[in-house]
């Protein structure tokens, strides 16, 4: 029987190369051109994207990136590299590559890196705990395009998601417990997930169900009463309805109703990024406190913590 050599491909969304309008424009153009992300008619979308959205949004988004930029790059890139390196140390006999759907390093460069290591089987782990067509589906599409250009393709194991994985839920629960121990138990734990258009869910994307699964399992692991855990959706874009309730509107409502202390976690983000460090930790903190809230803490993503890396190692082991 032929010996198989397995490699691991960690996939995530991507990030601009620099906190500048030019770099952000390049990144947003690639990201917002993907039909998995925006499936509007190209005849309508292209003029809007190129003539309005990119010129207006790029300078503003670049300033937001600059506010969270780290010495080694964007937070997503820094933490993703740390995850790759830590998993490679945990699995020293297994090549581990990092690829992004948009920007650098690309998914194609990650596949080529693994093939250069003479692997004949790749375990693809999209770092999106809850499946969505706009994230995991985009990785699948790009991987298929990459392999379509190869004369010889490796065996592929593709991990769809891990919304209810035991190690993942335990890692989240331990992170919440540590935050409660540090800041005191809040009146409410708010779990904020990235939103998608409601239409995508209506057409069959089971993302909201996967988010509810994670929320239910995490609340159970924490032994918290259902009324003390709330699920919301953030980062909506455009005019059509997205999954509700919206995070910012919910925080405003809670502050106005007299809820004093809230802690917020984003279980759908495997690594901290602009949407967690700026939108949730800063913007939404101001929303809650401005509406009358008293205490607000953001619970960081799992990033490259030992528990998270162990979870990844155990997850890919089942597919090797």
Swiss-Prot record:
<keyword id="KW-0350">Heme biosynthesis</keyword>
<dbReference type="InterPro" id="IPR019772">
    <property type="entry name" value="Ferrochelatase_AS"/>
</dbReference>
<feature type="binding site">
    <location>
        <position position="275"/>
    </location>
    <ligand>
        <name>Fe cation</name>
    </ligand>
</feature>
<comment type="subunit">
    <text>Monomer.</text>
</comment>
<feature type="binding site">
    <location>
        <position position="194"/>
    </location>
    <ligand>
        <name>Fe cation</name>
    </ligand>
</feature>
<comment type="similarity">
    <text>Belongs to the ferrochelatase family.</text>
</comment>
<dbReference type="InterPro" id="IPR033659">
    <property type="entry name" value="Ferrochelatase_N"/>
</dbReference>
<comment type="pathway">
    <text>Porphyrin-containing compound metabolism; protoheme biosynthesis; protoheme from protoporphyrin-IX: step 1/1.</text>
</comment>
<keyword id="KW-0963">Cytoplasm</keyword>
<keyword id="KW-0408">Iron</keyword>
<dbReference type="InterPro" id="IPR033644">
    <property type="entry name" value="Ferrochelatase_C"/>
</dbReference>
<keyword id="KW-0479">Metal-binding</keyword>
<dbReference type="GO" id="GO:0005737">
    <property type="term" value="C:cytoplasm"/>
</dbReference>
<protein>
    <recommendedName>
        <fullName>Ferrochelatase</fullName>
        <ecNumber>4.98.1.1</ecNumber>
    </recommendedName>
</protein>
<dbReference type="GO" id="GO:0046872">
    <property type="term" value="F:metal ion binding"/>
</dbReference>
<dbReference type="Pfam" id="PF00762">
    <property type="entry name" value="Ferrochelatase"/>
</dbReference>
<keyword id="KW-0456">Lyase</keyword>
<dbReference type="InterPro" id="IPR001015">
    <property type="entry name" value="Ferrochelatase"/>
</dbReference>
<dbReference type="GO" id="GO:0004325">
    <property type="term" value="F:ferrochelatase activity"/>
</dbReference>
<dbReference type="GO" id="GO:0006783">
    <property type="term" value="P:heme biosynthetic process"/>
</dbReference>
<keyword id="KW-0627">Porphyrin biosynthesis</keyword>
<comment type="function">
    <text>Catalyzes the ferrous insertion into protoporphyrin IX.</text>
</comment>
